[in-house]
């Protein structure tokens, strides 16, 4: 009550924010005539003067914002014949401040972005503009380049079809770079697999504007970007698990604590999980021919069965995936587009391939990964635009520290949003939708029908064909024509069926004749789990004050109502005595549906938050490794000093491990053990004479001294610059291989950590502890394994000169095979044994045992 009184007197927080921006808009408007009277050259010079002040740090961006926005507005008029409205200036200020600007469809977000882009590009550090697909990235860059070019800025576009690093690097070197979220993220991961700073394509993460920010930072937050390579694991288990899954009976969950679940397994649609019952475990063990399905030996088999049951019971063909050219291709649940090149992780994709009886592709191992959440949080300043953000304002604030500001429309929205119509069955609902389409089509009013899946869009397509109503279908199966189909959706008599938010980012324009007919009619055929997606569908009509209508048709058989809210609504319908074919239209019911959506949104938010808590652990490790890797790539980094410190640390580790071992009773056994270890790990022969009568600390110092001398002697045959390069590349190879291995260990840890809760332990706390231990092991192995490799590799000067070039070639080949796949092969060891009493091969004239047969190199492995 008090909050509503407060709002009535003082306005909402958003109203107060907008009022603050309006004061500055008046100041920008006051400058319009000043810049209007300048010639093109004078306007350009004025801009250069401001740019110089920024680069010399004489002024801040905030101090020149009014002038720069006024200049950009003037340039927009001259180059594009487009003038930024006052509300667009507000949007520009919101973006510059690192916030999210919520702007309705048709309010010109593409033009708004030019204001903060130009302002922030003046620092010379680069600005990135992120869109959801290649089409929009290319379109926006081309449309707005006239403004940027006038002001002396270069514009680059990153497209998925560009295969060369050179093209990407050129785009990133531009002042302003447009591209998709996937390409930006993958370029970052690929950069951190390169062997030279010069090969990297990205520069620093300075300022980014994410278009359709809710789609990228919310909808796709649970989908990490992964670069992977193949594993050597067998695929037979998936075929067997699929056969077993087909023989298991679906049951019902227990309704009371005393009751047991029925059947072999229970499906939890709400949380999208499968629980195998005791009866199901016994049946599976019998079918697999194993004694204990959940023993350590059968852990992979149990996991494959779990994925097979998910594939059969939670994933529908033409809803979650399609079959194209005998391959399982994912359908993006938020856009309805095919996710070409993407695969479900954790063996789920293999389970779907087994289910559909197509070729099962190799399981992949993660080589590098990052979530969008953590990628975009790397930018010094992050901003976003969308038509729908307020419903997720809490998540944006808590996870990204982003405030949402709703920008007023330039012209009030004239669209009529009608209450939902709810039917008992889907069949009744389908018939009602077709009747409504026929009515609207008869008078020429264009209709856009939104469906939640490809399967549903095909149902409506077939029904419209029977009714002989001409129409277009836009779904993942024909997304190539997306923009063209959506552009025509506002024409008189047009009927368009679109999966979910397909065609987002493309405006639907209507002419005066259509306006007179009531504008575009949006029909939603079921509510999405998120209110935001429904609002996006409604928002396709009523752009820039155009008339329009929207209405959702629902049934009690729709997934949302069936899983999350059907009983209450069903009871209302039964009390009202609703007959077959009849519907109810009531604000109470609409509110009940919205409450069901809030439940789901809350579940998804917790899921994303939970994912981030786990990924934050891995992210800190990733940042540490990538920062260290970048240090190694820096030619100024003193790697030799690092190696010498590693030698001292390795000597301490080895001597402590052996000489403080209570099982080894005397110094002779201690030395023999040390000798074997050093011989095996470092390819060196230790001489007992060098270690006779030495205490533990003296042994450690002596070992360190010998290793240091051998290392320096080995590298002295090569020019200093070449030696440092070889050390750097060998170190990087070890780091990369161990990091990949570590990611695999982390995946295994994450998969099983949830079971700790049965032991009254917090899985997240346990994950943090264990991942920390794994990481400390990784750091130690990087230091010690790189040393071992250095001691095991022998070079001639000629080999050293060719080494770097070959290593770069191998790494490029490796990166090009990842999915990107490929694993480097180790060269064969060439071992040369010299008898101890023979002349030493070094040419000193001494016997081998008195020269290099003393404590020193034992054998050489040619790189």
UniProtKB/Swiss-Prot annotation:
Signal peptide from the UniProt entry: none
CDD domains in UniProt: DEXDc_SecA, SF2_C_secA
SMART domains per the UniProt record, alphabetical: SecA_DEAD, SecA_PP_bind
Compartment list: Cell inner membrane; Cytoplasm
Database matches in InterPro entries: Helicase_ATP-bd, Helicase_C-like, P-loop_NTPase, SEC_C_motif, SecA, SecA_DEAD, SecA_motor_DEAD, SecA_preprotein_X-link_dom
Residues involved in Zn(2+) binding: 840, 842, 851-852
EC number(s) stated in the UniProt entry for this protein: 7.4.2.8
Cofactor: record remark: May bind 1 zinc ion per subunit.
Top-level EC class as recorded in UniProt: translocase
Top-level taxon in the UniProt lineage: Bacteria
Name of the featured protein: Protein translocase subunit SecA
Endoplasmic reticulum recorded as keyword: no
Polar residues: bias regions: 812-829
Purpose: Part of the Sec protein translocase complex. Interacts with the SecYEG preprotein conducting channel. Has a central role in coupling the hydrolysis of ATP to the transfer of proteins into and across the cell membrane, serving as an ATP-driven molecular motor driving the stepwise translocation of polypeptide chains across the membrane.
Chief localisation class: membrane
Assembly and oligomerization: Monomer and homodimer. Part of the essential Sec protein translocation apparatus which comprises SecA, SecYEG and auxiliary proteins SecDF-YajC and YidC.
UniProt record similarity statement: Belongs to the SecA family.
Cellular compartments per GO CC: cell envelope Sec protein transport complex; cytosol; plasma membrane
Membrane topology classification: Peripheral membrane protein
Molecular functions (GO terms): ATP binding; metal ion binding; protein-exporting ATPase activity
Region (Disordered): 806-863
GO terms of biological process kind: intracellular protein transmembrane transport; protein import; protein targeting; protein transport by the Sec complex
Cofactors required: Zn(2+)
Residues holding ATP: 88, 106-110, 507
Keyword field: ATP-binding, Cell inner membrane, Cell membrane, Cytoplasm, Membrane, Metal-binding, Nucleotide-binding, Protein transport, Translocase, Translocation, Transport, Zinc
């Amino acid at each position: 009550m008090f909050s509503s009184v407060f709002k009535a007197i003082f306005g909402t927080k958003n109203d107060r924010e907008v009022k603050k921006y309006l004061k500055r808009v008046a100041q920008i408007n006051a400058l319009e005539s000043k810049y209007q009277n300048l010639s093109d050259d004078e306007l350009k010079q004025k801009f250069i003067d401001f740019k110089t002040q920024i680069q010399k740090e004489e002024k801040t961006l905030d101090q020149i914002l009014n002038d720069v926005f006024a200049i950009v507005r003037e340039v927009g008029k001259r180059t594009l014949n487009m003038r930024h409205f006052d509300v667009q200036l507000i949007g520009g200020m919101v973006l510059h401040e690192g916030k999210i600007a919520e702007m309705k469809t048709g309010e010109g977000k593409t033009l708004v972005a030019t204001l903060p882009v130009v302002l922030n590009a003046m620092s010379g550090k680069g600005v990135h503009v992120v869109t959801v697909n290649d089409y929009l990235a290319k379109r926006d860059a081309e449309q707005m380049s006239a403004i940027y070019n006038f002001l002396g800025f270069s514009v680059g576009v990153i497209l998925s079809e560009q295969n060369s690093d050179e093209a990407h690097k050129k785009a990133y070197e531009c002042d302003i770079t447009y591209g998709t979220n996937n390409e930006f993220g993958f370029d970052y991961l690929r950069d951190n697999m390169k062997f030279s700073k010069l090969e990297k394509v990205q520069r620093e993460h300075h300022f980014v504007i994410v278009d359709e920010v809710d789609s990228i930072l919310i909808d796709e937050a649970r989908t990490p970007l992964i670069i992977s390579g193949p594993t050597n694991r067998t695929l037979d288990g998936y075929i067997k698990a699929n056969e077993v899954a087909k023989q298991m009976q679906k049951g019902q969950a227990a309704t009371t604590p005393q009751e047991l679940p029925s059947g072999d397994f229970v499906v939890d649609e709400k949380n999208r999980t499968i629980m195998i019952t005791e009866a199901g475990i016994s049946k599976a063990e019998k079918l697999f021919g194993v004694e204990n399905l959940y023993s350590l030996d059968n852990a992979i088999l149990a996991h494959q069965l779990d994925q097979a049951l998910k594939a059969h019971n939670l994933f529908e063909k033409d809803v979650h995936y399609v079959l194209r050219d005998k391959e399982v291709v994912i359908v993006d649940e938020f856009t309805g587009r095919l996710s070409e090149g993407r695969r479900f992780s954790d063996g789920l994709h293999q389970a779907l391939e087994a289910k559909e009886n197509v070729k099962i592709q190799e399981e992949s191992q993660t080589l590098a990964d990052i979530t969008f959440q953590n990628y975009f949080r790397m930018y010094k300043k992050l901003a976003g635009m969308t038509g729908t953000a307020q419903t997720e304002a809490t998540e944006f604030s808590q996870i990204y520290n982003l405030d949402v500001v709703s920008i007023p429309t330039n012209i009030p929205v004239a669209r009529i949003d009608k209450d939902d119509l709810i039917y008992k069955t889907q069949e009744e609902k389908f018939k009602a939708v077709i009747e409504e389409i026929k009515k609207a089509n008869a008078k020429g009013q264009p209709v856009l029908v939104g469906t939640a899946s490809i399967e549903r869009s095909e149902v409506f397509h077939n029904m419209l064909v029977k009714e002989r109503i001409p129409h277009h279908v836009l779904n993942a199966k024909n997304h190539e024509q997306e923009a063209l189909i959506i552009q025509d959706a506002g024409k008189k008599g047009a009927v368009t069926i679109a999966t979910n938010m397909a065609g987002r980012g493309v405006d639907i324009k209507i002419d005066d004749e259509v306006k007179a007919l009531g504008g575009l009619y949006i029909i939603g055929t079921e509510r999405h789990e998120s209110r935001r997606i429904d609002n996006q569908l409604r928002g396709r009509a009523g752009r820039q004050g155009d008339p329009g209508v929207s209405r959702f048709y629902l049934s009690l058989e729709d997934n949302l109502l069936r899983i999350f809210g059907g009983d209450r609504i069903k009871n209302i319908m039964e009390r009202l005595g609703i007959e077959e074919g009849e519907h109810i239209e009531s604000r109470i019911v609409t509110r009940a549906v919205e409450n069901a959506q809030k439940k789901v949104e809350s579940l998804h938010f917790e899921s994303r938050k939970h994912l981030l808590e786990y990924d934050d652990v891995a992210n800190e490790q990733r940042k540490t490794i990538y920062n260290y890797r970048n240090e190694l790539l820096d030619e100024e980094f003193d790697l030799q000093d690092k190696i010498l410190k590693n030698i001292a640390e390795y000597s301490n580790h080895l001597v402590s491990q052996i000489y403080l071992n209570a099982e080894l009773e005397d110094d002779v056994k201690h030395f023999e053990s040390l000798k074997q270890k050093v011989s095996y790990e470092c390819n060196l022969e230790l001489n007992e004479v060098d270690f006779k009568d030495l205490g533990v600390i003296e042994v450690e110092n002596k070992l360190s001294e010998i290793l240091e001398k051998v290392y320096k002697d080995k590298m002295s045959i090569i020019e200093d610059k070449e030696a440092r390069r070889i050390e750097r590349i060998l170190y990087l190879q070890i780091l990369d291989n161990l990091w990949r291995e570590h990611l695999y260990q982390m995946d295994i840890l994450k998969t099983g950590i949830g079971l700790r809760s049965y032991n009254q332990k917090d899985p997240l706390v346990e994950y943090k502890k264990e991942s920390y231990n794994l990481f400390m092991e990784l750091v130690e192995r990087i230091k010690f394994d790189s040393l071992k490799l250095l001691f095991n590799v022998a070079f001639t000067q000629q080999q050293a000169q060719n080494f770097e070039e070959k290593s770069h070639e191998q790494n490029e080949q490796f990166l090009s095979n990842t999915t990107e796949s490929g694993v480097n092969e180790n060269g064969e060891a060439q071992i040369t044994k010299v008898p101890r009493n023979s002349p030493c091969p070094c040419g000193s004239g001494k016997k081998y045992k008195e020269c290099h047969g003393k404590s020193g190199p034992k054998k050489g492995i040619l790189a």
